[in-house]
Amino acid sequence: MVERIAGTILDAMPRLSEIIRTERVVFVFGFPPCTDVAVSGARWFEEKRKADPHFQVRAALVAEQCRMVGMASGAPWGFENPVSVFSGIFGKPNYTFHPHEFTGYCADDNYTKKTCLWTGGGFVMPSPHREEGLDAPDNRIHMAPPGEERANFRSATPRGFAMAVFHANKPRENLSLAAA
């Protein structure tokens, strides 16, 4: 069962504590919002800092909550973000990838977007699995036109990578699990 828990760690702690004590947590992964930390948006940092001196701390707290839950559960864990100020907060990422490296799982992910992963708890980084015969990866993330859906489009987790991570980290005693 996949359970998404929204809110701060303080809001979620009663349910998280129950899950960690009574259920088998098999994987924890976080997707901190990149709007305030990705270097692609650095030109707006000063303006944001004037409005809220702690704007990047708030984003880092999401990542830290993921790390804390992962460590408490004992399960493999990670969080992702594009190239960002997180390297200065959490250190060098454990891994990086581009979506096109996993087109063997989803050919629609044939694009570039360097994404960093900070991981622990025995997380296994999947080996690249590229679909043969595809054209060179495109630059759709950087070329996305302005609009209401631009941020959602740019921040969507590549399906091929998600499937690869699932297969690399799924519980070994139940090999019949399938990706949703």
Regions found by a protein language model. Name each.
Residues F29:
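A conserved beta-strand element that flanks and buttresses the S-adenosyl-L-methionine
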